[in-house]
Amino acid sequence: DCPSDWSSYEGHCYRVFNEPQNWADAEKFCTQQHKGSHLVSFQSSEEADFVVQMTRPILNANLVWIGLSNLWNQCNSQWSDGTXLDYKXWREQFECLVSRTTNNEWLSMDCSSTHSFVCEFQA
């Protein structure tokens, strides 16, 4: 069972937080709400639809952080001759994903921007 202020779907509990934070702070906030809680992840279109239905009345047309980013899986790059990549001439861009609450369209955003978010844990 989900706590009283959380919504239930397919054995998972969800809660919308209309307190804009950056991605890392939102993820940390989620982990502090309940054991096993993280920013929402979608395993099916039905689950995504449920979250859209849940968030729309609270946030209207808005964006919410979801639990996808490239913050922790930067690849170890090396040159084709095997030497390490010590010199970088490109701008490092850390991207995190938001979901549009009206239609679940995913958009990449700068991880330091602030948005509302949805936390989820397995009941």
Curated annotation (Swiss-Prot):
Keywords, comma-separated and alphabetical: Disulfide bond, Hemostasis impairing toxin, Platelet aggregation activating toxin, Secreted, Toxin
Disulfide bond sites: C2-C13, C30-C119, C96-C111
GO CC entries: extracellular region
Ranges of residues in domain C-type lectin: 1-123
Chief localisation class: secreted
Location(s), subcellular: Secreted
Keyword Disulfide bond: yes
GO MF annotations in UniProt: toxin activity
Expression sites (tissue/organ): Expressed by the venom gland.
Domain of life: Eukaryota
UniProt family annotation: Belongs to the snaclec family.
Subunit structure: Heterotetramer of the subunits alpha, alpha', beta and beta'; disulfide-linked.
Function: Potent platelet activator that aggregates platelets via both GPIbalpha (GP1BA) and GPVI (GP6). Induces a tyrosine phosphorylation profile in platelets that resembles this produced by collagen, involving the time dependent tyrosine phosphorylation of Fc receptor gamma chain (FCGR1A), phospholipase Cgamma2 (PLCG2), and LAT.
Protein name according to UniProt: Snaclec alboaggregin-A subunit beta'
